[in-house]
């Protein structure tokens, strides 16, 4: 947020200063945090190297093979979390809010690695996180080879080819005829992943410079050497254009009051 405030209010709009922001930066504005000194709709969005959709993994030896199993269970699964601001915590609350599930969240782990270790030890059974680390690093690479965990739900708009049997939350919404307001709440929380790791220029940056920056960024993301290096590091390059990010920022902020109030409650604001 400090970086966003600086780029918005302090940095000169000359095309020489850019900021890489948190993908969830719009949420602070949406729920009305007093520290916010920016309007995400007025940034000049340049581009993002990836989307950051979330997923929920569960130990394969647990009795929970689907979200429906969680709903029917008399004892809810235990999911680890770093705290109430973490992706793991927010995803669990979203599933409870929109799909009438119960998930027991164990708070206080210092970081994701400690949660994963707790899963291995059997202290907890599940964790929510973004897809990039799940597909790109240990222990997940080994876990997937050993079928140690299953992914129960994916937060993207379409299924991920690496987990083709895992439904998206939107498929489940369609199946269960989830009300429109609940879908909007999910969109506000989950579609932040479409921002990925976005670059922005200050408001007031000349349009011709914004175009130069967007074009240069798009060319860089398509550079074969960069794509090859990313593959070596088991990283996905799925660039999002500045124009698409601009539209997304407008959509995320333009929510009806009922949705905003539910998002505030979900985030504990």
Q: Language-model features: where?
A:
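Short beta-strand->loop
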Residues: 38-49, 102-108, 139-192, 241, ...
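Residue-level detector of anion-binding/catalytic polar loops
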Residues: 102, 125, 236
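An extracytoplasmic/periplasmic, membrane-proximal ligand-sensing/linker region
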Residues: 145-151, 174-175, 204-269
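Paired acidic/hydrophobic, glycine-rich loop segments that form the ligand-binding mouth/hinge
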Residues: 14-21, 78-80, 124-134, 151-152
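Hinge/capping helix and adjacent helix->loop/strand transition within the periplasmic-binding protein
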Residues: 6-17, 25, 29-121, 173-184, ...
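Short helices/loops that flank or line small-molecule/ion binding pockets
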Residues: 1-13, 93-94, 98, 113-127, ...
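Glycine-rich beta-alpha junction loops
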Residues: 23-24, 108-112, 131-134, 155-159
């Amino acid at each position: 947020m400090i970086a966003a405030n600086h780029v918005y209010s302090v940095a000169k709009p000359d095309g020489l200063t850019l900021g890489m922001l948190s993908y969830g930066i719009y949420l602070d504005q949406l729920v009305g945090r007093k520290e916010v000194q920016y309007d995400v709709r007025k940034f000049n969005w340049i581009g993002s190297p990836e989307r950051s959709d979330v997923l929920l993994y569960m130990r394969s030896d647990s009795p929970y093979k689907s979200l429906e199993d969680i709903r029917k269970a008399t004892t809810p699964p235990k999911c680890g979390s770093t705290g109430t601001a973490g992706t793991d915590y927010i995803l669990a609350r979203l599933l409870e809010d929109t799909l009438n599930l119960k998930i027991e969240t164990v708070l206080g782990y210092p970081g994701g690695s400690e949660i994963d270790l707790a899963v291995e030890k059997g202290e907890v059974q599940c964790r929510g996180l973004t897809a990039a680390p799940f597909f790109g690093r240990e222990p997940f690479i080994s876990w997937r080879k050993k079928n140690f965990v299953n992914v129960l739900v994916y937060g993207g708009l379409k299924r991920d080819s690496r987990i083709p049997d895992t439904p998206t939350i939107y498929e489940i919404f369609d199946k269960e005829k989830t009300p429109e307001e609940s879908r909007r709440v999910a969109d506000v929380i989950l579609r932040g992943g479409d921002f990925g790791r976005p670059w922005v220029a200050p408001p007031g940056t000349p349009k011709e410079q914004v175009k130069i920056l967007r074009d240069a960024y798009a060319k860089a993301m398509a550079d074969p050497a960069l794509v090859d290096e990313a593959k070596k590091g088991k990283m996905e390059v799925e660039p999002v254009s500045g124009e698409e990010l601009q539209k997304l920022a407008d959509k995320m902020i333009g929510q009806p009051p009922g949705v905003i109030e539910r998002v505030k409650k979900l985030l504990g604001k």
